[in-house]
Regions:
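RNase H-like nuclease fold core
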Residues: 1-61, 66-74
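Alpha-helical hydrophobic packing sites
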Residues: 3, 28, 86-89, 227-228
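Conserved NTP-handling cores and scaffolds of large molecular machines
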Residues: 4, 19-22, 79-80, 96-107, ...
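Hydrophobic alpha-helical scaffolding
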Residues: 5, 32, 58-62, 82, ...
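Conserved beta-strand -> loop -> alpha-helix junction used to position metal-binding or nucleic-acid-contacting
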Residues: 63-66, 73-116, 225
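Helix-loop elements that line ligand-binding/catalytic pockets
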Residues: 115-196
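Basic, amphipathic alpha-helical segments enriched in Lys/Arg and hydrophobic/aromatic residues
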Residues: 186-268
């Protein structure tokens, strides 16, 4: 989101070059920004690139929006689509949050309050099991000892398996763990776990893209999120932008990899 106004498109598609990260030559850099967040916006941008440039694209890392995947498949068909870990884990985290809120309503009849066990545990539930303190482990044991929380515990287990797959040092093993996870939620999920079933449908549909990450190091969208953070800071420092062209120009100057060249131009 580049502006907070009622009129006009509030969103832009941010296009990042991850090549320096993959090659170890530097940080990711902003390539361009396109008004709108749609298949057509990204497809048009790709179509406007020279054919030689498009033919050179090997990997496209993206979030879960299927419009980007379709656009890439049509304009750079030889490129491998990769759904990055940040957004895959976010899908799992969102499923966990929705389960927690639903169970909270079923038990207490209201949204979470500061003294409600599930509400108090909301951040702890998102912590990787390997990073939990002994005190947090005891709190979780107490939380899951309540049979009314069994659906939260089941969804939490899926979320933890997802994190474990990505944190596995051996990529081949990590890929096997993720494939097993996707298979386990693709069918036979209890009807009560509606959020897990929905997650399973999404992961099954994008399984090839999710698993592709383990074969291609350096294709995480993490650097993209880092650039998005810098752009958010830029908008705050400028007290907002009213003109998209100016916003794109300032963004390219800030994160397009030009600053070092402007500050330290080569002579001769």
């Amino acid at each position: 989101m580049w502006r907070h106004t009622r009129k006009g498109d509030k969103y832009v598609t941010v296009i990042i070059d991850l090549t320096p990260v993959r090659d170890g030559t530097g940080p990711a850099r902003l390539l361009d920004m396109v008004e709108g967040r749609s298949k057509q916006a990204f497809k048009t941008w790709l179509n406007e690139r020279p054919k030689a440039w498009r033919d050179g694209v090997e990997v496209v890392a993206m979030d879960g929006f299927t419009g980007f995947k379709t656009a890439a498949a049509e304009e750079v068909p030889d490129a491998v689509a990769v759904m990055d870990p940040f957004h895959v884990v976010k899908l799992g985290g969102d499923a966990l949050d929705r389960t927690r809120r639903r169970v909270q309503q079923q038990i207490h009849g209201h949204r979470g309050r500061k003294n409600d066990p599930l509400y108090r545990a909301r951040r702890m539930l998102h912590t990787g099991s390997g990073l939990l303190t002994q005190r947090q482990i005891r709190r979780l044991d107490l939380l899951f000892a309540d049979d009314r929380h069994v659906e939260v515990e089941a969804t939490w287990g899926i979320y933890q398996r997802m994190i474990e797959a990505y944190r596995e040092p051996d990529r081949a093993t990590g890929k096997k763990k993720m494939a097993a996870l996707i298979k386990s939620v693709s069918h036979g999920v209890p009807k009560a776990l509606v959020e897990v079933a929905q997650l399973g449908r999404t992961l099954t549909k994008r399984a090839v893209d999710v698993l592709a990450y383990f074969d291609r190091p350096g294709t995480s969208n993490g650097p993209t999120e880092a650039i998005n953070g810098r752009l958010e800071h830029l908008r705050g420092s400028a007290l907002g932008f009213r003109n998209l062209t100016n916003y794109i120009a300032r963004s390219l100057l800030e994160t397009g990899g030009f600053r070092s060249q402007l500050l330290h131009p080569q002579i001769g």
